[in-house]
Amino acid sequence: MQQKCYYEILNVSKTASGVEIKRAYRKLAMEYHPDRNPGDKEAEIKFKEISEAYEILSDDSKRSRYDQFGHAGVNQQSGFGGTGGFGGFEDIFDTFFGGGTSRGSNRSRASRGSDLEYTLEITLEEAFFGVEKEITIPRMESCDSCDGTGSKSRSKTTCHACHGQGTIRRQQGFFAFEQTCPVCNGTGYSITDPCDACYGNGKVKKQKTLKVKIPEGVDNGDRIRLQGEGDSGSNGAMNGDLYVQIIIKEHKIFERRDINLYCEMPISFTKACLGGDIKVPTLDGEVVLKVVPETQTGKVFRLREKGMKSLRGHRRGDLLCKVVVETPVNLSAEQKELLEKFADSLGEDYQSKHAPKSKTWFDNVKDYAKKFFE
């Protein structure tokens, strides 16, 4: 039996941040928890799936293996049973607020770094070909002066308020849950000689320069995840991730819609009448387009596979060129005389013979007038 996608189980995208995954899990776990659905086998199965998905996607190492190899990369790592490792609602609150056991203590002492976001503006050409960009971001990194301890002497004293747990147990109505210790801010220890460089935080803000590979075909709003390039974790915990959001600059010629490109192509009055070849710019060079005689404004020519590459396959979009017939301007007296002779040569049956759109329009006007005055 084919296993369900963990991302689909939690109703999140594959680029979802840790915060988004946690929020989605909490909502679903509260909805399908067996304590809320006694005797409901389907809810119990759903809760097991949700718990299994969260255990994998909330762990950076397991999530990375899952993204690379699918279920095969994590099946041997995940042993699930019962209700996915949760007893009652208190266990769910422990997951998000910390617990009174050694497990909660470990979480309070080791905290994963925060995820960061960066907006990167690129050109349509860069999105077409793909590009490597260099960016500089501010992020929190471990303090070199105190090796991340926050202490000059690199020594720590157990917090007297929480006794090293990092959390203090609270009772609210029927629920008992843990809150971060306000004395030590969840670290489980206190510092008597704070480091002069980081003021006891163990972290300092630094500028980090990174190279980001932008794949060809990337679109507005796409996010690229750089694992481990977010803020530094505390006490040996993993770093957060960096999410680079792509913004594509407006182009002077082309408009993008999904994987297709669109443009308006001005042609001369004579070229529209007589036809001929014209050079059309594309993102990867000029191409020659054959304009058929008697081409009208609004006609669209499709250039196959001259659009953007699809990120989700090997398809490439098309370039659609809309014709705009330009009316001549700044005419000399001689040119105007020639045009008048040309107009006279068309004769009285000009509309019926030489202007099909004009004929249709006037016919519609006449029909409308008849109905209006009848």
From Swiss-Prot:
Report residues binding Zn(2+) 1.
143, 146, 195, 198
Entry keyword annotation includes Repeat: yes
Which residues form the CR-type zinc fingers?
130-207
What cellular component GO annotations does this protein have? cytoplasm
The protein's assembly and partners: Homodimer.
Identify its protein family: Belongs to the DnaJ family.
Q: What is this protein called?
A: Chaperone protein DnaJ
* Lineage, broadest ranks: Bacteria, Pseudomonadati, Pseudomonadota, Gammaproteobacteria, Thiotrichales
Its gene name is dnaJ
